[in-house]
C-alpha cells in the first residue's frame, strides 16, 4: 500500500522518496476506506501536494491551465454533442472532460433524456469549464476555486433544479466543494435508476450478464453502489 511506504519515508525524512510516492498516489480512497482510526489518506496526499512542507514544489500537475481558464476542458475544446434546447429546461447536464473524451456515454445519456421526455441543457455548450477536480487533486486550490466559482455562476443562472453528471470525478467535487443550495446534484446512474423506478423509461432486459466496475470516486468516494446495479440488473 502506498500509504505504508509514504509514512515510512516521512519517518526517515527522505524528501526525494516522499515526493515520488506522494506524486504517484491515484487518490483512489482505499487507504481511507480501510484505515482503522479514520485517517483520510487521500486528503493528506492532496495537502502534501499543496504545501512546501518537505522542501519541494507543490506543483505536481502538467495540466495547461490556460486552456481551462479559457473555457476548454482537459481533453477536447468543444463538446461532441450538439442538441437544441429552450429557455425553460430544468435539467442541466455537465458532461465534463472524461465524458467528452468517451462520447458514447454522453450520447447515451442524452438519448435517455430524450426518451424520458425531459427538457435539458448541456452546460459544456453554454460556458461551462473543467469542474476543477484535477487542479484540486494537484494541490492547486486557488485555481480550482476560480473554476468552481465560474461554474457555480453558470449553474445558478441557468435556473436548473437538477445538475446531472456522468463523470464520477466531477460528481465528487460538485457534491463536496460546490455550494449549490436548492439544486440537486445527481450521477447519471442514480438518475437512470430513478427513471426506471418511476416508470418514465422502460428497460428491455437482454438476459445478458454484465461485469460492473465501481469507480473509486463513485463507490468508495461517494457511497453509490446499489443504483448502478439496479439499473443494469
Stretches with model-predicted labels:
Residues 2-166, 171-173, 177-178:
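Iron-sulfur-cluster electron-transfer modules
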Residues 88-90, 159-160, 182, 203-209:
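A general structural motif
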Residues 97-98, 189, 216:
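Short, flexible loop/turn elements at secondary-structure junctions
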Residues 106-109, 177-181, 200-201, 225-228:
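Short, glycine/charged-enriched secondary-structure capping and boundary segments
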Residues 112, 154, 194-195, 231:
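Residues within well-ordered alpha helices
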Residues 170-172, 191-194, 217-220:
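Short, catalytically relevant binding-site loops at active-site mouths
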Residues 182-206:
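Short, flexible loop segments at boundaries between secondary-structure elements
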Residues 197-233:
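Redox cofactor-anchoring modules in respiratory/redox and cofactor-processing assemblies
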Amino acid at each position: 500500500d502506498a500509504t505504508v511506504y509514504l509514512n515510512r519515508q516521512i519517518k526517515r525524512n527522505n524528501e526525494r522518496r516522499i515526493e515520488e510516492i506522494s506524486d504517484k498516489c491515484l487518490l483512489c480512497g482505499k487507504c481511507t476506506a480501510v484505515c482503522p482510526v479514520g485517517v483520510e489518506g487521500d486528503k493528506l496526499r492532496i495537502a502534501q501536494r499543496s504545501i512546501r512542507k518537505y522542501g519541494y514544489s507543490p506543483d505536481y500537475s502538467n495540466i495547461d491551465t490556460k486552456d481551462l481558464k479559457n473555457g476548454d476542458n482537459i481533453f477536447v475544446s468543444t463538446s461532441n454533442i450538439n442538441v437544441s434546447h429552450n429557455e425553460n429546461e430544468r435539467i442541466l447536464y455537465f458532461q465534463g472532460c472524461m465524458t467528452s473524451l468517451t462520447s458514447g456515454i454522453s450520447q447515451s445519456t442524452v438519448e435517455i433524456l430524450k426518451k424520458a421526455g425531459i427538457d435539458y441543457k448541456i452546460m459544456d455548450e453554454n460556458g461551462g469549464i473543467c469542474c476543477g477536480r484535477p487542479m484540486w487533486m494537484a494541490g492547486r486550490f486557488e485555481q480550482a476555486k476560480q473554476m468552481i466559482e465560474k461554474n457555480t455562476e453558470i449553474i445558478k443562472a441557468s435556473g436548473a433544479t437538477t445538475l446531472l453528471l456522468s463523470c464520477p470525478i466531477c460528481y465528487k467535487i460538485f457534491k463536496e466543494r460546490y455550494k449549490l443550495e436548492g439544486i440537486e446534484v445527481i450521477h447519471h446512474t442514480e438518475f437512470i435508476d430513478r427513471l426506471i423506478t418511476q416508470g418514465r423509461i422502460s428497460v428491455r432486459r437482454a438476459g445478458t450478464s454484465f461485469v460492473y466496475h465501481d469507480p473509486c470516486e463513485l463507490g468508495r468516494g461517494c457511497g453509490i453502489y446499489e443504483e448502478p446495479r439496479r439499473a443494469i440488473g
